[in-house]
Regions:
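Sec-dependent signal peptide recognition
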Residues: 1-9
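N-terminal signal peptide c-region/cleavage motif recognized by signal peptidases
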Residues: 13-14
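Extracytoplasmic copper-binding redox domains, predominantly the cupredoxin/blue-copper superfamily
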Residues: 17-139
Length: 139
């Protein structure tokens, strides 16, 4: 009976333990960097939710590579949230500003097993150099 109570408690409390992290889509951050996400590398746990919030017009979120082949593209100027249930690295960008390096990574559950997939993902302009730098920062 004690075992069953423990199992039930874990399942009941699990959603309470999940976090909601906010990432802002910025034209400019406090250091003067233009077209950036407020958190370029977010480290979260399975079950956590990330909410992207546009602070200016013209931004969105488009998933480019992920461990579960997640296809997602938000509408411009809209707040959007995704709950991450699959461990691994997720790579996303702001579609209108991808060439300016407006990208981000999410590491779910500390799992870096798809780092090669992310390293080889499509990138160009400033994005290519920035993606390489962000991936290197994970090791």
């Amino acid at each position: 009976m004690k075992f069953l109570s423990t199992i039930l408690l874990v399942f009941i409390c699990s959603p309470v333990l999940a976090e909601d992290i906010t990432i802002k889509m910025l034209n400019k951050d406090s250091d003067g960097n233009k077209m950036v996400f407020s958190e370029e590398v977010a480290r979260i746990e399975v079950g956590d939710t990330i909410t992207w919030v546009p602070t200016s017009k013209g931004h969105n979120v488009e998933m480019r590579a992920s461990p579960n082949k997640l296809k997602f593209k938000s509408k411009p100027n809209k707040k959007v949230a995704i709950t991450f249930d699959t461990p691994g690295i997720y790579y996303y960008w702001c579609t209108p500003h991808k060439g300016m390096g407006m990208i981000g990574l999410i590491v779910v559950g500390g799992d870096l097993s798809n780092i090669d997939q992310i390293s080889k993902a499509k990138a160009f302009g400033k994005t290519k150099k920035k993606l390489k730098s962000l991936v290197q920062s994970l090791n």
